[in-house]
From Swiss-Prot:
It catalyses: RNA(n) + a ribonucleoside 5'-triphosphate = RNA(n+1) + diphosphate. Belongs to the RNA polymerase subunit omega family. This is DNA-directed RNA polymerase subunit omega. Keywords: DNA-directed RNA polymerase, Nucleotidyltransferase, Transcription, Transferase.
């Protein structure tokens, strides 16, 4: 079973699309050499580490609302 589960992540971030997008961007940063923000990640893969960061609250999401008018 994967940790954290999608159900657990959706308690804090309701949109699956947002979870995937943010995790992918953060995983790319980790893969490019940035250190994971979780002290002892359970996953050794960047995507798993990014999801753990989202679940623990170590990675925040900034919503940029643009007016398309």
């Amino acid at each position: 079973m994967l940790y954290p589960s999608i159900d657990a992540l959706q308690r804090t971030i309701p949109s699956k699309y947002t979870i995937v997008t943010v995790a992918a961007k953060r995983a790319r940063q980790i893969q490019d050499g940035k250190a994971p923000k979780v002290a002892e990640p359970k996953s050794y893969k960047p995507v798993g580490q990014a999801l753990e960061e989202l679940f623990s609250g170590d990675t925040t999401i900034i919503v940029n609302e643009k007016n398309n008018g």
